[in-house]
Amino acid sequence: NTRCLGSFVFLWGQKEERTPTWFSMFVEDKVDSLPLKGEKTPMVEAMQRVWTGKELDETAPIVRGMTIDGKSAIDNVRIKAGTLFKAEVSVTDKENDSLAYVWEVLKEATVLGFGGSYEPRPERMGDVAVSDKNVYETMIKVPGEYRLYVYVLDNTGFVSTANIPFQVID
């Protein structure tokens, strides 16, 4: 449109999106035990493409879906406390880069901000797992509401993320 004078990307001031991965241009870079360095998300790639009109030589991995025991988020995943469960993420990468998978389970957010107010990062359950596999197994012994996150990193500075909420029941 010839009437468009330009565009810009902005940040509210701090993260307030219920999860550490929603609507981010870059992933976190200073979180204990997470091997993340502020890698670029697909939104950075999209903005570069829109602003330059050119395809990039390197692109972010594409997450096609994520399941826990074969169920997606829409299936209201429930797991019995102390039961081993298996998560799987389906990913493609246009350039066939080698991929690394970083998995973590966080408690579901309970401190919810409003209108851009600060929300603390939810508490982590267990250890961060780093692997070259798109499959992750773990168990949670304490009933409650949780969210499993995966960060899929290529070797070019891009990352894609997915998460799935689940409930652990007695």
Residue ranges and their predicted role:
Residues N1-F114:
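Substrate-binding clefts and catalytic carboxylate motifs of secreted carbohydrate-active enzymes
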Residues A81, V142-P143:
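Surface-exposed loops/turns
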Residues T92-N96, P143, N155-G157:
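Short solvent-exposed strand-capping/beta-turn motif centered on an Asx-Ser/Thr pair
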Residues A100-E137:
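Exoplasmic/lumenal beta-rich domain surfaces
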Residues F158-I164:
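Extracellular and select intracellular beta-sandwich modules with Ser/Thr-enriched
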